[in-house]
Structure formats: structure tokens, C-alpha cells
């Protein structure tokens, strides 16, 4: 007798082992038809999986997130099936699920073209109509490797050799195609109805630039066409908002081959940067942080003591001088510990909060670089809090409050918070981890925040909180971090004198709100589609004269506004006013101030807000007050 507990708490009993599909059928024909897989004691399995013991089971359908993952994984295999039918000489490698879709890497003797993608997608649709059953079988390592070698699939054979001996080798087949996979997969290809191939890109075998370059075909798959259409529309909008395109259009920055992963900031872009940095500086100063500056290049011995030389050297830029090895800092924390150590610290000095807009460099792979979002040289709004164990909860509460306020001011209202908990390999005792994890929970609760817990995702030296902001397109970006560190203070010898005159290690909190300034500016540009709110905009206003006779008034008006702190410029070119308005509208300036003879004579200004909104003629003082109200409300 096999007892199956269902999600509603009911128990069904069967006289013999049953498959997931049979359980679904016993519940109802609708569920049997909708079943894509099952969650057996928490593990995703195929509908063909046999249950021969008492267990809990949830039937997975296309209404579940797991169901969508199964669909996407199966569509990746369908893609490989279609490619092999159309291009038999192509070799298949791997095809995982990714955010919003999947990809599959192929080795082929020529580049795939857009026309090839159309043919492949059409063939996939034909295979779906066949509704071929997907079958799974477990085979020996030798049998699997021998099979793939016999059909010339050397990459699959290599993958099999790298699979741990204890793992099962599963082969999935539909029609004339067989692939190596952990699964699970849909019961038949007819379940895969909504998909689209997106693009081809290059990729290295096993992600190593020393290996062969493969061709990666990206695709997306959904349960409903409406969802796919919405996603494709979002991609179109994202293309319009691409910060690289807007950076060029708005003359904010550029990047060039002579300095890969580094940014050349133009005057307007640097003005935007300065608004963000000055705002962040004001907020951390108000929160009791002390701003410091630490060296960019430090001796190898310090990086060895911190552990970075042993564990992070591949990502560090190094140099040598006078027979000494140095590294350009990839992060600021070791330098901050040096400042803390400089002089005897007492418990009365704590908490000490050190902030730095620290310039860091990391040797990212060239293929991973992406505009401002992934760079080699970047500045972090970094800070480290040194406190006692009794203070770390109150410090965490204060940081949560500060971070939420900052995100709101920048226009981000939806923040997802994730708490990463202890990994298997970790420093410190279970009791220490218990206190640390519960302390971070208590801090989040005190702020009225909700969070998702990620068991096993913490760093070996402590748990952390991540802050993921959602932009205008619903995309999630991890920006802020609050990381508790149980290791670095000890590694680098940080200590303070406690109230009983003993020497103790401080608790160290690594924290950032925006993270990489470059990346955050890229996110801001895309979130606002380049139309930065007035408090951030490089120019808040442009004064435009209609004719030469108003040029002097326009110039004096711009100078007067500048003295009042307005970021303003005057466009006195001898061009039609309609041309100038159109040009500055495309530059997304918040306010256009038009002056003609009437405005000059009355010492007023005609104000047009971004979006073509005519606010009419008003005294200059009224415009300044309106702008100041925008700034007060972060508009």
C-alpha cells in the first residue's frame, strides 16, 4: 500500500506503486491533462516517475512557476532537436533555463543567421504538432558515453565524464532525438506551444576563453501567448531605454576599446554622477558616518592577510615595483580595517561608521562587460560599521531605514529583500550564526519589512541581506547589501578595549546602498528612460530666445538662475524656436524657458515642462519656487 499526501492535506492510497501521471488521473481528467510534472517530497520529477513509497506529492501544471521552468527546459531540448534535424553536423552541448527563457549552445562550422533562426523556429513548431511523447531512461555511464561518441557528440561524452560517479545518468528522448539531462521534462512535445527564438551570441565551451567558441541560441517560452507578447513588448521598451543608447543620445558618457570596462564621463553625465554622489554623501553624513579615503594600490601582504590574494587573485589587477607585488583594490574593506586599527579603540568609540566613495577595479572577463552595468573600474558607496555584538541589531535597523528612504527618493518603490543564511562550509559556531541570523531578522521585522530567506546562500564569513530594486519595466536589480563579517576583523587584527579592559573583536558590517555607482546610474537612466527628475537632471532648465533681440535678457536670466543654484544653460543660437524646442525636448530637459519680446519687457518667462506641457507665462520667481518644490519632493 502506497499513501500519497496531497497539498490540501488529503491522503490517497494505492495498492501498488503508481506514477505521478496516474495519481493526477485518479484525481481528475482535467488535472491529468494539465500535469507537466510533480513535486515529490519537494523534488521536481517527471509525470512518468514511479512512486513506490509513502510520500507527499504536488502535481505541477503550467499555473506553477515550476511548471514554467519545465516548459522552458523542454523547449531548449526541442530547439536542439530541431537544429539536429536541419543541421545534422551541428554538435549539441548544454541547454539550461535562464530568466524568462532558455538557451542552447551548439558547435557548428558556420555562424547561424537570422534566416536560420526562422527555419529552426518553424521546425520546432512542426515538431510540437507531432506531439511526440518524451521518455526517460536511466543508463550506465559507459552506455551513455558510448552512445554519444557513436553519434559524434563529443561534448556530451565529455560532460558525462565529469558527472560524479554517484549521480544517475538520465537520457531523454522524443522522436529521433536523445539528450543527456537531469530533467524533468514535459510528457510530450505538444505541451510546448508558446515560444520564440530571440538571438544568437558567442559562448565559450565551459565558459573558458581557452576553449572552443560555440554559438548560443537564446529563446523564450511561456504558458500563454499573452504573457509572451507582454514580455516581448517589455523587451522593445527596454531597447528604447538602453542606457548605452541613451548615454550616446544624451551625451552622458562613452566607452572605448583602449580602456575596456572603464567609463569616459562627459560633462552632462558627470553632472548626473555628482548629483547622486552629493545626495549620498549628505545622507550618510546625516546618519553619523565618517567619510574616509584609502589607497587604491596596496601591498600583496595585506591582500594575503585578508584572504583576497588566495581566493580572488584572478579578478585583481596586480603590478610590481621595486621587487614588491601590489594589487589595485577590488574592494574597500581591508583598507577600512586599517583605519580602524590605527590607534587604540575603546568600546566607548563604537559604533564607528566609515564611509568611502571608493574607486575599485576588478578584472572582469571581456565577454561579461556590458555598458555601465558590468565594468572593470567602478566606485562604490561603500561603508563599514564597526560595533559591539550588542549594537549590531540597532545598526542594522538604522541601515534598513536609510536604504529604504534612499531608494524611495530615487523613484524605486518596490524593493524585494532576501536574507542569505549559513552555508555548509562556514566560519564560526552554530550559536554565533544563530545570533547573527536572528539579529538580521529582528532588524528587518523592526522596520516592518518582509523578506525571502535563502538557506545556504550566505558567505562563509556571515549572513547577509540583499536589497533588490524593481525598475519601471519590472526588472529586478540587486543593489544594496548588508553583510555581517565574522572573519575579516580577526584576519586583520582589528580589536577594541571592552568595558572590562579585555581585548575583543568588533562586529563588522559591510554595507552599500546603491553598490556600484556606474551600475546604479545605468539603472537610473533606464528606469527614467533618460528623463531624469529635475533634482538629478544634468540641466534642470534651458533658456531659449525667440529672436536676437531677446538674447541679452535670455543670457542674464540664465546667469540669475545659476546664482540661485539652478543648473541651467542658455541656447542663443540663431535658429527657429521650434527647432530649438524640439532639440532640447529630445535631450529630455525638465523645463524649457522661452523668452520673446513680451517676456523680456515684463521680466517674465514662458515655461514648458517636459512632455510638451505648457505651464504658461509666469514671473521668474514663480518658476524658481516651482522648481524648488520639485527638488523638495524629489521630482
Curated annotation (Swiss-Prot):
Signal peptide from the UniProt entry: none
EC top class named in words: ligase
Residues binding Zn(2+): 333, 384, 510
Record GO cellular component, one term: cytosol
Enzyme Commission number(s) from the entry: 6.1.1.3
Highest taxon above the source species: Bacteria
Cofactor note: Binds 1 zinc ion per subunit.
Subcellular location: Cytoplasm
Family to which this protein belongs: Belongs to the class-II aminoacyl-tRNA synthetase family.
Subunit record text: Homodimer.
Name of the molecule in the record: Threonine--tRNA ligase
Organism for this UniProt entry: Burkholderia lata (strain ATCC 17760 / DSM 23089 / LMG 22485 / NCIMB 9086 / R18194 / 383)
Name of the gene this protein is made from: thrS
